[in-house]
Amino acid sequence: MLETPRKLVARTFALPEIGDDDGLLRVAACGLCGTDHEQFSGDLGGGFAFVPGHETVGIVDTIGSKAAVRWGVNVGDRVAVEVFQSCRSCPACLEGEYRRCERHGLADTYGFIPAERAPGLWGGYAQYQYLSPDSMVLPVPAGLDPVVATLFNPLGAGIRWGVTVAGTRPGDVVAVLGPGIRGLCAAAAAKEAGAGYVMVTGLGPRDAERLRVVDDFGADLAVDVAVSDPVKALRQATGGLADVVVDVTAKAPAAFAQAISLARPAGTVVVAGTRGGGASAPGFSPDAIVFKELRVLGALGVDTTAYRSALDLLASGRYPFEDLPRRTVGLDAAEGLLLSMAGESQEPPPVHGVITP
């Protein structure tokens, strides 16, 4: 449990009694991303204390009869738990935009809910995770390793941000800014959608290992922007600029101006990486959007359709997600993994970090 920023402690909770409408998950694995470290460091505010973890895969331990029908799963089934909850009745939920559920909103999500709200088990850094009646639960394909299955979240993001929101079409030239796990997943999603050429950019030694593996995940070109001009590199490779640019960088203010420069006239720029409150965009001129007639879109969260597609793609084996540079640890080593992923330790950050309770 994260009691306060940078204070991750072990805490015992009583397992809840399960009724007709809810369930209990025995956690098999929980993936980590940049959001986890932002919570840990306090950069992303929240209602401390809480159990982090929002990329959970596990086995249904207990389930109510109504919940089993609603989710289509039973005791012993392996499932993935979506980040957001849905009341299934407000206008936003009925339109499929349950990220904006009137009952739950954006903050009332797994891995963010204060532990003072019973039963406290609202995240994947635990042996068990509570499944509320409004949870969104997805069956995991048989034979898919639970550690690999935690990629349902970043790959779902790659599909939604890099294809659905962007409107990526066969033959498109796609530039992905940021070679972290979501960047790799966006590259794979774009290639899977038929993109004709995919470039992925990174920055300096920290991203070196990530850039070395991007070609296994659909990228045709990897560019270290500390060494090479990505606009020049893309022009040399394709004869032009990108139809679609997907910016999944985090805390990289200059990336937005670079994204605008990489987009062709009338192209699309999808911004999914957050910059933090008050961040500027060095080198960016709004006039560039006007003169190039760009379509600039924000992307937040993932939906069930993208999650299901992600699980199917993971199960297909078409991309070597099982071979990603990965570090898997128990609950007692979670803090060290968080520090490593943020570049705050002597160990190089893994592309994919996972906790297995």
For the regions a language model picked out, list residue spans one by one.
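Short Gly/Pro-enriched turn/cap motifs at secondary-structure boundaries
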Residues: E3, A14-L15, G47-G53, E116-W122, ...
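Glycine-rich beta-strand-centered segment in the early N-terminal region that forms part
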Residues: L15-C30, D43-L94, R99, P141-G143
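Cysteine-cluster motifs in flexible loop/terminal segments that predominantly coordinate metals
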Residues: C33, E82-L138
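Cytochrome P450 core scaffold surrounding the K-helix E-X-X-R motif
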Residues: T35-F40
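Mid-domain Rossmann-like dinucleotide-binding core that forms the NAD(H)/NADP(H) cofactor-binding site
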Residues: Q127, M136, P141-V227
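Rossmann-fold dehydrogenase core element
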Residues: T268, G283-D323
